[in-house]
Amino acid sequence: LWPHYLRTIPSMSVVEFTPVWREMKEPMRIARGFEVNSRPIGEKGTRCRYTTTKEITLQPLALEHARLSTDPDGRSVISLRFSCSHLAHWSRVDLSQIPFYFNADAPLACAMHEAFTMNTARLWLRLPGDGDRRPMDGYFTALGFGDDDRLWPKGDSSFSGYQLLLEYFTFREKFMFMGLRGLEAVIFPSELPWFEIDVVLAERWEHDFSFTEKHLRLNCVPVINLFPLESDPLTLNSLQTEYMLRPMRVQDGHTEIYTVDSVMSSSQHTYVPFSSFRHKGGMMRHEAPEYYYHTRVRRGPSGLHNTWLILGGEAFDNHTVPEDESLSLTLTGTNGQLPR
């Protein structure tokens, strides 16, 4: 019922974009699915293709420093100082959420995550020209749990909680993100060289290790080794029940098929996934599509995983499939074990 949980989990990582923020006049949005390439890997120097798993907004600012200190009353304070582009009109820049990534080993990253998202007592804001800091009505929120944060597409018939568990145990770095909320309520001047936020912790920072701005990164987003592919056209044969799929124009010896996204016949019949139970033949679905497809993965002689396409449906049972029917497929590919 859930074949997607039996597939190989693709390679994943977190990338940091480094815009020339001093020259930016406004935020820049990068849509989900933006493609990045790895460094050359292996004997053939293959560049593995990764795509971003969510949209990211690059702001015209940078985190200049992050410093941990102690207030006169004994409370731990984290000071975050941001440098801002002099070309941006800051009264118009949307700062409703600034995402951060905890770029550290697991013990430090988890301690920082807990301090910011669960141990914050108060936030203070300091602007140029202010004699003293002012209270700020803001907070930090944990990221990575929303429907828009999924690392790979969710199956129609699966429970989203299972995917969260699978993502946590396979790529915990996805949940090492947090977002700063509340700056949209601040009235900034049109020209803003810098601003500073003091995060007062409810409980003292008792850990032996400290952190700097190197451990708190802006402009980061998860990426996964998935990318769009096309398959060689298939011509149906009445004597065949399975068809091995081959990516079109890919002969590098590393590319594998991760999913079959759509199947369309030359007579404009749409095949639906068997696991979606949207095909004709039961549950009073008289108007549903007459065709379905299913995939099976087998390891080939070369060690790569080959994907086989299995076709069925009421049209096949009644032998009403047109002769010389051909299929066009859209696929999602991966580089398999090569990037690991």
Residue ranges of model-derived segments:
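N-terminal start-of-chain detector that recognizes signal peptides
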Residues: T70-P72, E167-T170, G300-P301
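Extended assembly-interface regions of large multimeric machines
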Residues: L1-G131, P135-D137, T141-G144
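Short, low-complexity Pro/Thr/Gly
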Residues: R81, L87-T295
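Short, flexible beta-strand-to-coil junctions
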Residues: V20, D105, V200-E206, S328-P339
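Short, aromatic- and glycine-rich surface loops/edge beta-strands on solvent-exposed regions
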Residues: N37, L192-A202, D324-T332
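C-terminal accessory/interaction regions of large nucleic acid-associated machines
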Residues: D261-R340
